Amino acid sequence: MGFWMAMLLMLLLCLWVSCGIASVSYDHKAIIVNGQRKILISGSIHYPRSTPEMWPDLIQKAKEGGVDVIQTYVFWNGHEPEEGKYYFEERYDLVKFIKVVQEAGLYVHLRIGPYACAEWNFGGFPVWLKYVPGISFRTNNEPFKAAMQKFTTKIVDMMKAEKLYETQGGPIILSQIENEYGPMEWELGEPGKVYSEWAAKMAVDLGTGVPWIMCKQDDVPDPIINTCNGFYCDYFTPNKANKPKMWTEAWTAWFTEFGGPVPYRPAEDMAFAVARFIQTGGSFINYYMYHGGTNFGRTSGGPFIATSYDYDAPLDEFGSLRQPKWGHLKDLHRAIKLCEPALVSVDPTVTSLGNYQEARVFKSESGACAAFLANYNQHSFAKVAFGNMHYNLPPWSISILPDCKNTVYNTARVGAQSAQMKMTPVSRGFSWESFNEDAASHEDDTFTVVGLLEQINITRDVSDYLWYMTDIEIDPTEGFLNSGNWPWLTVFSAGHALHVFVNGQLAGTVYGSLENPKLTFSNGINLRAGVNKISLLSIAVGLPNVGPHFETWNAGVLGPVSLNGLNEGTRDLTWQKWFYKVGLKGEALSLHSLSGSPSVEWVEGSLVAQKQPLSWYKTTFNAPDGNEPLALDMNTMGKGQVWINGQSLGRHWPAYKSSGSCSVCNYTGWFDEKKCLTNCGEGSQRWYHVPRSWLYPTGNLLVVFEEWGGDPYGITLVKREIGSVCADIYEWQPQLLNWQRLVSGKFDRPLRPKAHLKCAPGQKISSIKFASFGTPEGVCGNFQQGSCHAPRSYDAFKKNCVGKESCSVQVTPENFGGDPCRNVLKKLSVEAICS
């Protein structure tokens, strides 16, 4: 009897756990999961921007970094490339991705949208949607709403069928409908508001059992939670008092565009922004991005968004830790979680500590107390009095006190190591074969129309390329044939790039930019008496991903097209007979694939084309040993696309040099996307990620299509590895270890901080490049001695670190031969070479 009673009680307990407790709700303090308010740290990882083989490692590293939730968009055009034909495999296996997150013990925030933006091609919309009769995007339009509801319902039903919502025992605790709709609604007016209310009701009626959010939109209807996106969101307040303060996109930097420099965001400012949000009552923060990844294939939007979507995220494009950002934020998350009991219990009280300083204190009835001491001054340290103690606050920083007494973390004091990454060649170059693609002609698979057609309407985005071809008849009596003053061809295009061929010869190239994709070709061209063939190769570089009325956007040669300098004056070519051909011959033959590559006759050796436009190159190589991330150095090439074993690494365009000013960037002060830049005057993207899972042990096919003309012999396969590691630690820097000792009762006096150095597995510290205890200056990779320097700064590191994978050295004067300058705030800067 006792056995069966125990079994019955166990069954009832299981039912209670699965049915009674599994719930997600919210109040004004936080998201409530299974009855418990939670401070949630989230990170964006977009499943198609990495490979399934990378997912477990990325998610594990996010978890180790203190992340509780993985956030992702759902990419409609990846899942329904043709109307009614769905795809959920390989990089688009959404269910598998969510289950990998679940296996790691993390939650999921599923941003169904289905508009994504995300610098993704066409904002995530499938191009076929543009051609649904009567459609108008993201407004009170029946054809659009019907398509949106159908896809959203399909995704929700898939999640339910796999039991992936938290209320079913799964990891999904939040969903999002629409995306950043506030600016759109403001522009559209009443139709936008009606659509927004419809979208909210449609989503709630799907019955997911978890809350829905709408981001960057102040007037979302109940019960939807409105949330904030931006570089800072401490100012944000939800539109109802019963909703939690949530930050769905804390931008870790910004995207890279072809022709632009590479943005980055200092770890200190990122931590400051997050701490500032938490101290003002925020309880959910998502890093956009935590791992940015790669825009493989033709998935980048913009137009002109680069193939790399690195975003200066805590995990870099290749999946490696970006230090110190990953480590500094990990320490921040640990400090915040120590404060969680107080943070979720009460609203803060605010006390001024000076003109630019304040304290925000969370003190619960149960006795939990946490304090955030902030110094908003961008230029000066502050010494503040709080709770009968004094605290030193660096400029533009926040100190976190989980017991309202002891500082465990300051946003401007980085305890994590920095790492300098390097790209090491793993091959001496490749043995190439080439195939030259001629300018298209009327004899090719073409169709004819009088006048100029919009590009995407013709290509339906199956290719970046559309040929516009026409004939120009030149009378033998034309004056320019004798004078040598060539006639002037002018072509107006909606974008994004254009190659002009005259009688099969390249006459010029023009291209736009993200800010101004439209372009004009205007140049003299060499014509002969008789019939001349004009071939315009119009190129799309990703479809726009943001803005109103997607159905109206266009690309390609829309005209006018004219020829000046003839006896007749100007000849309008716009309404001539034009021949059209979608794509390239090499695309039609699938030259990039293992099966299609043998379909043409390639040349090799001295006959390989170099610096020739419209050239295809191929080679084979064996996979290198090891497990370091791999990339192709494409710096000697112009523009085109790259494939490995038939899989596209993305568009390459290293010849588009970046503009902008890359001046020294300080972490203090307001950050925006133009503040901190690198790569000025260089190619926007040199390195192109090669996923190891795409490689065979031997015989890998590498194919490059080059539009402009480059030198393929400069292409090299490289591995990405740590070149050196650094520590930059102040004396008496706050550290969590002292707090842990205090809580354990083993605290007698605070311990000095330590410099921790760690190379990658398989590497060892081979030498110490720099070490100085005193007042060193500079940053990792470029340290210099200051006016104060302990002469034995190197000794402890040579003794304790050289020959080891990792080491720790306490930052205390005794380790460096004594105090080199008393009554001066000192720090230790060290750089160790990994090999």
Swiss-Prot record:
This is Beta-galactosidase. The lineage of its organism: Eukaryota, Viridiplantae, Streptophyta, Embryophyta, Tracheophyta. The keyword Secreted does not apply. GO terms for cellular component: plant-type cell wall; vacuole. It comes from Solanum lycopersicum (Tomato). Involved in cell wall degradation. Degrades polysaccharides containing beta-(1-->4)-linked galactans, acting as an exo-(1-->4)-beta-D-galactanase. Keywords: Glycosidase, Hydrolase, Signal. It catalyses: Hydrolysis of terminal non-reducing beta-D-galactose residues in beta-D-galactosides. It comes from the Eukaryota.
